[in-house]
């Protein structure tokens, strides 16, 4: 599966324990997303178009109206990368 660089960054943050909070319009559509790392920092690469691509590919999921997290398919798709800490 082809995953863009921005999608890969977001998936990597989610795989480390991050989450995506979202705002819905009255019609039920997601209008705004904010991606948080496990430390509570905001990831700037996580825009609405990147989120929609990840959701369309079923790489992120939300259960019981909770924040979006990485799905099992997303965990298998994300490429390993070094974490410079």
Curated annotation (Swiss-Prot):
Q: Which InterPro entries match?
A: YjhX_toxin
Q: Which region ranges are annotated with the description Disordered?
A: 62-85
Identify the domain of life.
Bacteria
Report the sequence similarity comment from the record: Belongs to the UPF0386 family.
> What is the official name of this protein in its record?
UPF0386 protein TM1040_0419
Q: Which organism is it from?
A: Ruegeria sp. (strain TM1040) (Silicibacter sp.)
